[in-house]
Amino acid sequence: MKFQKIRQWCKKRKWWLAAAGVLLIAYYFCLPRQLFPTPTSFVLEDANGDLLNASIAPDGQWRFPFNAHVPEKFEKCIVAYEDKRFYYHWGIDPVAITRAIKQNMSGKKVISGGSTLTMQVVRLSRNQPRNIWQKMIEAVLATRLEFAASKKKIIALYASNAPFGGNVVGLEAASWRYYGRKADQLSWGEMAALAVLPNSPALVHPGRNRKTLLNKRNQLLDKLYRRKT
């Protein structure tokens, strides 16, 4: 009797169920197998991992190959600066989105986007215009990425593909470009300076905006100190 009721319920809603099935299949396959098919630099290192030589990538960017290892300092800095609820959401942060909507409406212009780190990874991989429609697509893809990858992997994808000013892409390339050392060897101050760059990569420019960069870095360091990081 119970089975017959379920069968009747499904029969009455067969088109809705079919549509839901199609949407689920589309959702499952919506994420590309390779998020970043972009070319990378040829990198030559010694036995200790120190850089001996590197060539620019075919697209003119200093983009080192993907590195699954992300220094703890950078992870703490970027989460504190970009997405403090990163470890607790599934790709989208309703609190951040609500705050962004209020700020934008109050200021009558785009002040905040409310994007999570996961959404930023998706945006970096797609390179599409920044508008509301694309933001909605990024949100859907971000939830799918959260099912497909660990939080550590998402941080690593961000660190390897975020822009760090000029034609420098990725944390490791930025570390060598600006400090001449591996990312693992950077101080908290140096790492904090790099962590604020992807949000405004134009901050790094010879003789321009250095004060703004230092202010953002110091604000991040103060936030980390107050959180006893």
Residue ranges and their predicted role:
Residues 2-229:
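Juxtamembrane regions of bacterial inner-membrane/periplasmic proteins
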